[in-house]
Amino acid sequence: KLRAQPAANDPGTDKTIKYSKIQSIIQKINSFTHENSLLANCRAVVELIDDLYRKLYSWFLHVLTFEDIQFPGDTFLDRLLKMDYCFTYYPSSNRHLIDLFEKTLDNQTFTNLDKFFDTSGNSPELLYQKTFSLKIFSKNLTAQDNGLYIYPLLKTDLSILDFLGTENILFHRGLIYHILHQKTIPQERENDLNKINQFFATVIQQVIETKSSCLPASLSQLLDTIFHFNRIGLNMETCRTYIEILSNHMATPDTQPIINTFTINLTHIVFTAHVFFICMENFSPTFIFYNRKKLILEQQRAILIIERNDYSTLWKQISDHIDCLFNVSLSESFFKEYTKGGNEDQKQFLYKNLFEKWGNVFFPFTYSVSTSNNSTAHHITTLELRDICKEVYQSDSPDAYESLLPYSTHPSFKTLYVKIYVIPMVSHITNLTFDKLQSDCRLLTLIHACKLLLPSQHLLLHYMAWLYAFSINVDHIDLGTFTVIKSVIFKIADHINVMTHTIYSPETNLLVSILLNAYTNYLQKYVNPWIKQTITANFSLIQTYITFTKQCASILATKCNINLDNLFIYITIGTDKIVTTSFCSFIATCRNLVRQHEEFEKSLQTIQISETTLTGMLRNIITSVSSSKELLTNEALQKFIDTVQRISQHVNETYQSISMNLEKCKTSNDILIESLKKIIYIVDVLSSNAILNTSLASRCLEAANLAVSNNSFTILEIKKDAVAVFKPFITQLFESMKPTTSLHKKLMSTQKLTTDHIPFLDTFDDRYNLVRHVERQLNWYAAHAEAAQQDLITPLKF
C-alpha cells in the first residue's frame, strides 16, 4: 500500500517523504471532490474534476522510480531489467539510472554475463530484448539499435530462470514468448513453471479478484493498483505487447497442461491490467467517466471476443472486476440532498437532467402531472383519435405532432400515439443505413414529439436522444460502438412493447450497416496489416526455402569423387563435370546445408501458426456476427457472412496447398540431409573436438569400424537436359563457400593464441595435404592401405 505519513519524530527517508506527499495530495483531491459533491451534475464543475483526475494519473506515473519497484531479493539481471523498464517508460523520474546502470555493470564481479546471452540464433523471441542486450554490452541505458552492431542477445529459454526472479518474469517478454510457443516443458524445468503459475495465481487473488462487497475503490486503492502492476512489469505499453503476443498464439491439443495453465493465468492478468489502465487513464468520479466506461468495456469486449470466442467466460470475470473497481453512481439520498428545497417541477427537471447526463436510472422518481381538463380530448372516440394520429403521421409538416397536444390526456392516447406514430417512425429510422440516418431529420422530429407528448417517458426519450447524438457526433465506428447502439435500439423497442403490450421488432438495416462498417474498420485496422505483414514474411520464407530445395535437389543429382593426392572434390552429373572444390569447402557446405535445413524446420512452423491465427480470426468474425440472431434475416448481413466464409475456405485451401508442397520439399530435402549427416559424421570421427571430448583411441576404433562398413548408394538417372538446370544452383552454392583468407595468411597472423590448451589440429587442414610418392622420402614408413590400418589399430585393441 502507499505508505502513511511518517511519525512526527521520524525524519523519514526519501521514499517515505515521497509517499507522504502523495498521500497528502490524494487527501486534498478527496476533500475537493467531497466539497463539490452537490455540484456533481454541473457540467462545468464536472469537467474540472475530470481534468484534475486525469492530470493526477499522468503525474503519478511520472513520479514512479526504479527504487519503487525494486525488491530486496532481486538478482543482478532483475535489477538491470527493472532499470531498463523504468527508464524506457518513465524517463522523467529516472534520469539517475543512466549512471547507476553503468556503475552496476562496472562493479559486478561475481556474475559472468556470458551466461545470460545466446549467440546461436535470431528467432523472434530473442528480438523482444534486443535493445536491452545492446544496452548491456554498451553499458549505456540510452543506447538504441540502428542495425549497425552485431551482439549476443539475452537468452529466452527456461535456463534464464536461473538468473531471473519468478516475480519478475513479466519484465522479460522474450521468455514469455518462448514459454507460450512450447508444447512441452523439460522435466527438470517443470518446477520453475509451477512456481510461475503459483505467482500468477497469487497476483490474480491479491490484485485482481473481485471483492465480496462491490464497493468502489478509493483513489488511494486505484493508485496502489497501478503501483502493484508496475512492480510486476505491467503498464499500458507492455500490456499491449503481451496482448499482441497472446493474439498470435494458439494452443494445440497436445500442449502440456502446465503450459495451458500458464497461458490462461497470463491472459487473465494481462487483459485485466490492460482494461484497468484504459479506465484509469479516463477515470474521474463523474458522469463523464460513467459514460466513457460503458463504451470502453464494450470496445474491449468486442476486441477480445473477436480475437478468441473462447474468452467469453474470462471477459465476464474481467468486466465484473473493473465494474467493481470503478463503481461510480448516484444514490437516492444524494438526489434528496441535491433537490432539497425545490418544488415538484424543479425536482422533476433535475431528475430528468441527472438521467440525461448519466444515461441510467439509479432510482425511481414518482410525481403527478397537473393538466387542465380538456373536454375535447375526452369526448372524441378512440377511432377518431386513431385517425387524427394517422393524419399527423402522414403529414409533411415537421411540426404536425403539435396538434396532438390537446388529446394527450385521452385515456387511449399513449397507446394509440405509440402504435400509429412512434412505431412507424422508429421502423423508418432503423430501416435506414447509417449514412442516410445522418442526413435524415425524422429522428430529431420524433424526439421533439415524444418530449412534448410523452414527457414522463424519460428512458425512451434518453435512448432516442442518445441515438441522435451518436448519429451526428461519431467519427469512427468500431465493434464496441455497434454493441452500444444495438443495445440502445432494442431498449427503445422494449419500452415500446411495455407501453403498447405488443411485441415490436425494429428493422435491421441500420444495425447491419453499422455492424458492417465496424467490421470493415476492424479488418482494415487489425486484420489487413497483419495479413500483409504475414504474407510478406511467409512469401519471403517460402521463396528462400524453394531456392534451398532446388540446391538440395541439384546435389542429389550429382556424383562426388575425391582426389586423395590433393584432397579436392570433383562434382559431376553423369559425364559432365560441374565444379571442383576443396575438401574443406565441401564439408563446410555440407554443414551449412544441414544447419539451414534445421533452421527451416523451425521457421516454417510460423506458416502453420499464421494459418491457425488467420483462420481463427475469420472463424471468430463469423461466430460473432452470427451471434446477433436478430439481424441474421438481413440480406446484406447474409452476403457478408457468405463472403467471409468463402474467404475462409479459400484461406484453408491455399494453406493446405502450401503445406502439401512444403511437405514434398521436406521429403526431398530429408534424403540429402541424411546423406550429408553421414558424411559429416565420417569426417568428424577424427576431428579435433571429437578427440578432445573423448580420446584418440576411441576415435581411431570408430574410424576403423566406419572404414570396413558397407555404405551402398544408388545413383539417380539424370536426363541430359537437366544438367543446365542443376548446374547454376551447384555452382552458386560452392562459390559462396570458397575461403576468403589463404592458409598462408592464417599461419602468418600476429594474433595471440588465447586457448588454454594446445588444440588438436584439423586432420583435413591444408597443411596436411598428402605428399605424392611418399615412399621416396627418407625414413618414411610406406605400406599398402590395409597393412597400414592394421599397424595403426592393432595396438589400440584390448
UniProtKB/Swiss-Prot annotation:
GO biological process: virion assembly
Alphabetically ordered keywords of this record: Virion, Virion tegument
Keyword hit for Transmembrane helix: no
Acetylation is among the record's keywords: no
Predominant localisation class: virion
Subcellular location as annotated: Virion tegument
Pfam family, one: Herpes_U30
Entry GO CC: viral tegument
Signal peptide positions on this chain: none
Superkingdom of the organism of origin: Viruses
Alphabetized InterPro entries for the sequence: Herpes_U30
Family: Belongs to the herpesviridae HHV-1 UL37 family.
The protein, known as: Capsid assembly protein UL37 homolog
